């Protein structure tokens, strides 16, 4: 487990360094910290979040860490995503994502996830954008005490909207299992809704609802549960020129 965690970190760091483009001197670094409480069915606890990203005209790198410490369960999620726009068609971009997840509430003691695909800014506008993505993805997990790889076709829709008083985010992803190596149907839908309300310079109050649903799985009864979290967050810039 420790070795796999190290591989994940090295892969993310390598992608961040190798993914830099010629416009490095225009790159902007930001980081975000959040802490608060989380409520799920018949359980509650504390939540923590850290995010750091680097963006330039054509490239974007984003590393996120989520931690939920519940009374009876725990949730850990680490994700690194890198993307680069096509210079001739800047509304299109290619991306890759690598992630590690542990979710005892959903019966996921361990999952390594990877996906690669194509994204499109369907509707960019002044106050936000709507993005769609398609990708090929795979998991290596322990749902069935089995480490065989499970492959998926993945689609996603993402909407970000900002106003002077509040920012909102809506994400919906569907993973359709295409691998037949694992008998269990692990096709799933993941959704997240987020509201960010500014408090003072750099600080905000954040409300998030998330759900992961396995409608065709025999273990769905134990998994179709959402979480509601409330946190206070801070964001700032990092004066790096990497």
Q: Which functions belong to the PLM regions below?
A:
Residues 37, 48-56, 80-86, 116-120, ...:
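Residues on the lipid-exposed face of transmembrane beta-strands in outer-membrane beta-barrel proteins
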Residues 35-39, 63-69, 80-82, 96-100, ...:
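Transmembrane beta-barrel strands of outer-membrane/channel proteins
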Residues 22-26, 36-43, 68-73, 103-109, ...:
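Outer-membrane beta-barrel domain signature
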């Amino acid at each position: 487990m420790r070795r796999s965690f190290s591989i994940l970190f090295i892969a993310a760091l390598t992608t961040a360094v190798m993914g830099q483009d010629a416009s490095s001197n225009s790159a902007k670094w930001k980081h975000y910290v959040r802490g608060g409480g989380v409520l799920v069915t018949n359980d509650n606890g504390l939540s923590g979040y850290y995010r750091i990203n680097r963006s330039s005209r054509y490239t974007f790198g984003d590393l996120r860490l989520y931690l939920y410490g519940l009374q009876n369960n725990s949730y850990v999620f680490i994700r690194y995503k890198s993307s680069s726009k096509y210079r001739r068609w800047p509304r299109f971009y290619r991306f890759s994502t690598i992630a590690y997840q542990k979710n005892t509430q959903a019966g996921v003691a361990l999952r390594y996830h990877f996906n690669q695909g194509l994204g499109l800014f369907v509707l960019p506008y002044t106050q936000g954008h709507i993005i769609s993505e398609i990708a090929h993805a795979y998991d290596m997990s322990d749902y069935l005490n089995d480490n065989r790889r499970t492959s998926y076709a993945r689609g996603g829709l993402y909407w970000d909207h900002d106003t002077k008083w509040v920012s909102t985010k809506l994400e919906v992803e569907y993973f359709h299992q295409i691998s037949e190596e694992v008998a269990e149907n692990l096709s799933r839908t993941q959704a997240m809704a987020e509201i960010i309300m500014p408090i003072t310079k750099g600080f905000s109050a954040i409300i998030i609802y998330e759900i992961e649903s396995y409608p065709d799985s025999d273990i769905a009864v134990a998994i179709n549960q959402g979480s509601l979290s409330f946190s206070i967050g801070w964001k700032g810039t990092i004066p790096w020129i990497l």
